[in-house]
């Protein structure tokens, strides 16, 4: 395992500046956000200008890209899958093998979500990329049992584990071991049952226990700091603290 950080940690800065801040904080690996609603690079831009997107994502200032976080807002199903396909080709061109995607919102028919995930996995597999479905409150993966069922029903699907949503969400800190065997990517911040993000060291995330559970499943990939910019929060200090904390446990 190794420590990384998401460009979402500096979503208020241009991509070049966000990457430089992460370098200054001594990170060596990065998850890059491709988000239509405000990421550093939009999936529609990737689809329209793939080669330009590849060039941008290769200029990472000594940071190694380890995952893309993809959030698409398309007018049609065909456009949605075309943009996702372009993101997969970007991943292959930049030697990234993980794409994190969100599950659909609660209330979506289970079979419809299975069909969507099957198509995403099919497109990703063509480029040698793994789809990691994010565990998230308010969405179909908010229940760890359901998240595990998705992986069992969609061959090749994995999970992006965000344990904060199992601590703060409806799960309220109950065990979630059943998802561990399916994890391909991890996002971390400190959280309590009442607040998704608190200062590092003031939350309920048991980092040592979590890393032990991942190690039992032979997980060797990124532990990605994903701390959102907030008013009155020293972002640099928080990112430095979580990096040092995670590195001390490895």
Predicted ranges, named:
Residues 26, 33, 80, 128-129, ...:
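A general secondary-structure boundary signal
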Residues 31-55, 107:
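Glycine-rich, proline-tolerant flexible connector loops at the mouths of alpha/beta enzymes
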Residues 6-10, 33-37, 70-73, 104-106, ...:
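Active-site beta-loop-alpha junctions enriched in small/polar residues
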Residues 9, 13, 44-48, 78-81, ...:
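Conserved phosphate-coordination/catalytic loops
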Residues 1-4, 11-28, 54-61, 95, ...:
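Histidine-acidic metal/acid-base catalytic patches
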Residues 16-17, 51, 55-64, 70-161, ...:
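Active-site acidic/histidine proton-transfer and metal-coordination neighborhood
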Residues 40, 44, 78, 107, ...:
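Charge-dense, low-complexity intrinsically disordered segments
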């Amino acid at each position: 395992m190794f420590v990384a950080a998401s460009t979402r940690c500096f979503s208020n800065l241009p991509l070049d500046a966000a990457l430089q801040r992460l370098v200054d904080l001594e990170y060596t690996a990065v998850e890059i956000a491709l988000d239509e609603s405000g990421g550093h690079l939009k999936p529609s831009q990737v689809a329209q200008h793939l080669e330009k997107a590849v060039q941008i994502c290769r200029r990472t200032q000594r940071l190694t890209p380890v995952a893309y976080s993809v959030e698409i807002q398309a007018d049609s199903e065909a456009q949605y899958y075309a943009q996702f396909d372009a993101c997969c080709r970007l991943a292959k061109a930049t030697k990234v093998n993980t794409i994190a995607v969100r599950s659909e919102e609660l209330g979506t028919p289970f079979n419809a979500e299975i069909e969507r995930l099957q198509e995403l996995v099919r497109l990703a597999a063509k480029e040698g990329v793994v789809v990691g479905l994010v565990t998230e409150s308010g969405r179909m993966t908010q229940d760890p049992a359901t998240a595990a069922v998705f992986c069992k029903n969609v061959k090749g699907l994995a999970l992006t584990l965000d344990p904060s949503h199992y601590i703060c969400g409806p799960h309220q800190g109950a065990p979630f071991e059943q998802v561990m065997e399916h994890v391909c990517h991890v996002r971390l911040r400190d959280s309590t049952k009442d607040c998704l993000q608190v200062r590092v060291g003031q939350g309920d995330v048991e980092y040592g226990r979590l890393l032990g559970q991942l190690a039992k499943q032979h997980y060797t990939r990124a532990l990605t700091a994903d701390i959102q910019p907030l008013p009155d929060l020293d972002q640099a200090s928080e990112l430095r603290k979580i990096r040092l904390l995670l590195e001390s446990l490895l």
